Regions:
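C-terminal motif of bacterial Sec signal peptides marking the signal peptidase cleavage site
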Residues: 28-32
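Bacterial signal peptide processing site
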Residues: 34-37
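Extracytoplasmic small-molecule ligand-binding "clamshell" domains
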Residues: 46-48, 52-57, 62-153
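Extended ligand-binding regions for polar small-molecule ligands
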Residues: 51-74, 186, 206, 273-311
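Acidic, polar ligand-binding/catalytic clefts
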Residues: 131-193
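Short helix-initiation/N-cap motifs at beta->coil->alpha
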Residues: 131-143, 187-188, 204, 222-232, ...
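A ligand-binding cleft/hinge motif common to bilobed small-molecule-binding domains
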Residues: 156-165, 213-214, 235-268
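Periplasmic-binding protein-like
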Residues: 174-182, 250-290, 310-327
Length: 327
C-alpha cells in the first residue's frame, strides 16, 4: 500500500482493526467447540432461537428487496445503459468458492456473498437480478475485462496498484487478509514464521504468492491455478499449508472439517469489483451503489444471509470506498 494522508490512514487503520477483530471471531467460531483440535460450526443464525427470534433473510430475499437505480442515473450509451439494454450483467467469477460464490447442486443457483452482490448490482441496473457467470481465475480476470468478455469481476479480487494499471476497481466492498490453512491434526504451524522450511501451496499470480516471499522467505512454494487444487495439495500431503485470503480459507474449512484455519490474518486484502479500465462513469456508478447498500443496511443483510449462515458474529464494519491504493 502507498502512504496516505494521516487522517485517512487513521480512519482506515481503525476500520482494519475492526475487520481483523471480526475475522478473528469468525476463525474462532470454526474451532472453539473442538477441545481435541477438531472444528465444529455454530448453529445457523437463520434458525429460530428458543425465544422465538425470527429467521434471518435468505439471499434471494435480500436480493429481492435490493434497490433499483433511478432512470436519471443511467446515461445513454454508458456502461450501465448497455447492460440494461442487454438485460443481463455478465460477471466474471467462480462457482466453487464457499461462502462467496458457490453453485448449489440442488438448485443450480449461485450462492454466497460475491454472487449475491453481483445479483444486487444487476437488479440495480436492470431492475431484475439477471446475471451470467463466466468462470475466471487469477490468471484471466484482467484479460476478460480488457477484451469485454465480462462487464465486471466479483471474485474476492484484491485491489492492488499493479492490477489497477490494467483494470479499474470499485470499492473496496470487503476487507480480508492472508491466513494459513492446515490439516486439523497439524499443531506445529500457527503463524507465518512457522512456514519457513515447509511446503506451502497458494494460487499463482495471487497477492499471497508475493506475501509468502516476505513473511516466509524460506518456504517452498507450490503454485496452483485454483483454490481447489491448493486444498487438495494439503489434504493429500503434498503441501504442509495453504496461504490465501482468510475469507476463502474459512469457506474451505467449512466444506472440509479435516482442515482448519490457524492464527490471525497477517496482511490487508481489500476486495474490489473489477471493471473495464478508463471508464470513470462506470466506476463512479458502482461506487455510488456500494455506498447506497452500505448505508441502507442491504450489505449487512447479505452478509448475514451468506457468510453469516456459516460463522457466528455480527457483520464487520464496511470499508471506506476509495481507501485502498488502486481503488
Amino acid at each position: 500500500m502507498s502512504a496516505q494522508k494521516n487522517g485517512k490512514s487513521t480512519v482506515r487503520s481503525v476500520r482494519w482493526m475492526r475487520a481483523v477483530g471480526a475475522a478473528a471471531a469468525l476463525a474462532g467460531a470454526l474451532t472453539a467447540c473442538g477441545g481435541s483440535g477438531g472444528s465444529s460450526l455454530p448453529s445457523s443464525p437463520g434458525a429460530k432461537s428458543g425465544g422465538g427470534k425470527p429467521a434471518a433473510m435468505t439471499q434471494d430475499q435480500v436480493v429481492a428487496a435490493a434497490p433499483v437505480a433511478p432512470a436519471s442515473a443511467i446515461t445513454a450509451g454508458s456502461w450501465m445503459d448497455k447492460i440494461r439494454k442487454r438485460g443481463t450483467l455478465e460477471v466474471g467469477g467462480t462457482d466453487s468458492g464457499a461462502m462467496f460464490s458457490q453453485r448449489n447442486p440442488a438448485t443450480n443457483k449461485l450462492e454466497g456473498f460475491d454472487a449475491g452482490l453481483s445479483q444486487m448490482l444487476a437488479k440495480y441496473i436492470i431492475g431484475k437480478p439477471s446475471t451470467k457467470l463466466s468462470l475466471t481465475s487469477v490468471d484471466t480476470r484482467e484479460t476478460m475485462l480488457q477484451n469485454g468478455s465480462v462487464d465486471a469481476v466479483f471474485a474476492t479480487y484484491t485491489i492492488t496498484p499493479q492490477r489497477a494499471q490494467k483494470v479499474d476497481f470499485a470499492g473496496p466492498y470487503y476487507e480480508s487478509g492472508d491466513a494459513i490453512l492446515v490439516k486439523a491434526s497439524n499443531n506445529t504451524i500457527t503463524k507465518p514464521a512457522d512456514l519457513n522450511g515447509k511446503t506451502v501451496a497458494t494460487e499463482s499470480n495471487s497477492t499471497a504468492a508475493l506475501d509468502l516471499k516476505k513473511f516466509a522467505p524460506q518456504a517452498k512454494t507450490l503454485l496452483f491455478r485454483e483454490d481447489g487444487e491448493c486444498v487438495a495439495a494439503v489434504t493429500q500431503g503434498r503441501a504442509d499449508a495453504y496461504v490465501l485470503d482468510q475469507g476463502i480459507l474459512l469457506g474451505d474449512a467449512v466444506n472440509d472439517p479435516s482442515l482448519k484455519v490457524v492464527g490471525q490474518p497477517f496482511t490487508q486484502e481489500p476486495y474490489g469489483i473489477g471493471l473495464p479500465k478508463n471508464d470513470p462513469e462506470a466506476k463512479a456508478f458502482v461506487d455510488a451503489w456500494l455506498k447506497t447498500i452500505f448505508a441502507d443496511g442491504e450489505w449487512a443483510k447479505l452478509w448475514k444471509a451468506t457468510i453469516g449462515t456459516k460463522v457466528a458474529g455480527d457483520p464487520p464494519a464496511t470499508p471506506v470506498i476509495g481507501s485502498a491504493a488502486g481503488s
